[in-house]
Swiss-Prot record:
Protein name, entry field: Elongation factor 4
Keywords, comma-separated and alphabetical: Cell membrane, GTP-binding, Hydrolase, Membrane, Nucleotide-binding, Protein biosynthesis
Gene Ontology biological process terms in this record: positive regulation of translation
Gene: lepA
Pfam families: EFG_C, GTP_EFTU, GTP_EFTU_D2, LepA_C
Domain tr-type G: 11-193
Major subcellular site: membrane
Amino acid sequence: MQIKKINNKQKRIRNFSIIAHVDHGKSTLADRILEITNTVEKRLMQKQFLDSMDLEKERGITIKLNAVQIIFNDKKGDEYIMHLIDTPGHVDFNYEVSRALAACEGVILVIDATQGIQAQTLTNFYLAIENNLLIIPVINKIDLPNADVNKVRREIKDTLGIEPENTILVSGKTGVGVTEILEKVVSNIPSPRGDINEPFQSLVFDSFFDPYKGVVSLIRVFSGKIQKGDQIRFMSNNEVYEVSEVGVYSPFQTPKPFLFVGEVGYLSASIKNIDKVRVGDTITNHKNPTKQRLPGYRKIQPVVFCGLYPITCSKYETLKSALEKLKLNDASLTFEPETSVALGLGFRIGFLGLLHMEIIQERISREFDIEAITTAPSVIYHVYTKKGTKILVDNPSKWPNTQIIERVEEPFIKATIICPQIYIGTVMTLSQSKRGQLKDISYLDKNIAMIIYFFPLSEIMYNYFDKLKSVTKGYASFEYEIDSYRSSSLQKMDILLNGEVIDALSIIIHKDFAYSRGKVICSKLIECIPKQMFEVPIQVAIGKRVIVRENIKSMRKDVISKCYGGDVSRKKKLLSKQKEGKKKMKNLGKVKLPQKAFLAILSTE
């Protein structure tokens, strides 16, 4: 293709993302765009088309960003190439959103007409501003009977500073207003910059492993062009490969002769070593390289950690391989090997939040058919010793001896809660029970309040969001960011079973909650652990001090059932013999902890 034709095509490219709070209708709107532009045949169309995982469809949420090329003819009859990137809405997947925005020039900000601006709406709005993207505000779900368009328009003006006449009214369900959005994309979002004559330069914004093609990278081309047979170089590690295929998603993988400046597509180079490809890396032409790398992405730090152990030891290598493949597809995931006395070999895994943790566990089970035991989630604590050294603790097993600790700091988050004004009291009661510190209350309008709280991250890990939804009848939205580390009265709490510490059940806890949590854990374990032939004590200890003890009663065989009357000394002898046997069993016996016991601990508060 001649350079002049490519330049003309480049002027007709539009790259944009759809961003919104979770459940505001992003994926449904994306479905209507695909349908109206005939990108997907009607016989193939299904709900949440771009959500490729079964898990996404079941939960009704987007977990992974997805890119698709659309051909749109505007009202003048001119043809435009659009690259739509659908993004997640949950706070745990903000990293996915930031990666998608780096490949775009504009965004469609979707706001639910029934719920208005919510916490993640604000986060995504500011994320788009940070990336200097043009924002097209859209009010969705206008077909619902409880839609309040005027109220939402006022919120948009007061909170985001966008004039009401600049918003587009849309129904992702019926398709009303969708063509108007696409016309706005054409007229308002600029075409991508870059020069076809410059050396090839592209950003890897996602990747996944294909069993036949090896590592497939999703790229945005910022200059030059790439085609099959070209030699490419990854600029972070200088690895060189030959391109075996390039193409776009429209919406399925469609090979093309080449990708040129401004396009969003995929690149395969028969890369089998997963470690060689990094999200955020710059790819260039090996023979005619670009001089500098693209900014890429800041490395994101995990905030929640847990241990993951295969139920059978033989699955350890399989679990390791599964985690490597998931990390390729999810750059925010971290893991390292660890060993537990109770559970054997496993991994310490870092996540961006509890939903992220839950999703990864589900994917390991479904996609790789691996059954695994999960330990209680933890965060990174800063432990300062009396000698002045600082120890980072992400696992209770690394907790130092109490005698050498001077102070402990834990991560606090800044949480934004948006809810109807009538629920402020119940939200504050719940938040204070989680050691929350109120910072500010403001009002988006006379009925909607925005509450700012500081929480210890460890406290919101246990059912806070579920309880928040419950006390506000589902109307509250919650979003958070890591704030700072603060001093806290924290202790390591051990669980002993028959006198032995079960290291996988140890947790770090605030001293004010140790006794109550210990009582709950003991009760749960009594329900889960089957009775033995001997009495099994369950103890909760802080250091060497036992603060809670419960016993699992032993099973009892009626050894005197065959004694009919006669001398009582015969019965005493049999009972004494049984007692000695049980004492010996207690000293030698081992109690096997079932998997449901670990799950029960996770469900406690």
